[in-house]
Amino acid sequence: MKKKTKIILSTLLILVGLGLLGTAGWLWYDANVDRSGWELLEDGSYSYRDFHGKSVTGWLSLEDRTCYFDDDYRMVTGWQTIDAKRYHFGSDGVLSLGWVELEGSRYYFGEDGVLRTGWQDLPEGRYYFGTDGAMTTYWRDIEGRSYYFLPEGPMATGWQDLPKGRYYFDEDGHYLTGAQEMEDGERYFLEDGTMVTGWLDLEDGKYYYDLEGFKCVGWQEIEGKYYFFDEDGLMQTGWHEEGEYSYYLQEDGSAATGRQELEGQVYYFTPKGIMVVLVNKDNPIPSYYKTDVVVAEDYHLIQRVAQEPLQKMLVDCRAAVGSCGFNSSYRTQKEQTEILETRTQEYMDTGMTHQEAYEETLKTVALPGTSEHQLGLSADLTGKEANEWLAEHCWEYGFILRYPEGKKDITGIINEPWHFRYVGTRVSLDMKDTGLCLEEYLGAV
């Protein structure tokens, strides 16, 4: 009986002791009950208790977020440096990942949340981030080289049209400079990378690049003037020969036009720069002109360069209208003098004085040394139908109607529908439909 009473008293003492401990601040929990959750602190920040109800410090990964808690159990927000690495947390404490725009700048955070700096190869392209992590846009000098980054951030490659001009960036983002042989042609880039268009002065001479940046070769019309560039693109000056055509390229490279005095001699050039020998009462045959005549038909002679075109024109004309007479072509100084004297005498035989006869003769016969026939480039072809056909088609063979109707005051010769002068198709086709005689076309009036 006494032993049983002692056991009961001992049990009561234990229960009273436990009760006293509980009232002293001790709590007892079931270890299998989840006590995790958020707690709003007095300063407005949050802390988090884990499964056992213990406040968390350091990293915490939940199903929908990753957060970080400082040593005071507070969840951090904004920029944070943790273990010498930079991170960013939103106002809700969530770790920033991937692209984030903050205060007007873009940043990139890796899958681990670490802020990326320097060069970064991303799916959208290659980017560069400053030491503060801000994404670079537009021009940036990096380790002594200049790069351009698109407004969206990727490093520029290939062609880029920028405010200062056009650039080409290689796969490393370096812009090209100097002469570059590209797939579609040669271009030139200045030291600052801008593609050249227009004129370029180099040590060996002048070059010209079109609006697409291609180096020009051959003939080019630039601001109404004609220039010639060799196969390397170098602008040419001085005399330039192309088959039967001669050009004079002035000091600035432009082809001479109109009347020009060169080394004491008078030359005439078309609006496109082709030299044409002009012979009339004011322009005798120049000393530099050389004859090289061959047989055109029967006993008629013609300058070698005009032989084949004249023969073809005659064949085609006769095939079209049936006949075409060949009256006259090349004449020597002696022959021209004899014609002038004979014609003058014929007029005198009608009762004219010598002066009257001479003046009448000059309406159709040129003074020796000023006759087109002495060039060996003209032919008098007869027949009404033939002349009509030739007036329409002579241009196709390189000939012009030398003395058209209504131009006597300029040419000094009345209309001669039979007189055709060879100038080459480059000139004849350009003159066609202009309504100009040769003097007008060459700027000699």
Question: Which residues fall in each region the model found?
Answer:
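Extracellular adhesion/carbohydrate-binding repeat motifs centered on closely spaced tryptophans
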Residues: 2-275, 308, 392
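Extracytoplasmic cell-surface/polysaccharide-interacting catalytic and binding patches
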Residues: 10, 32, 263-265, 270-445
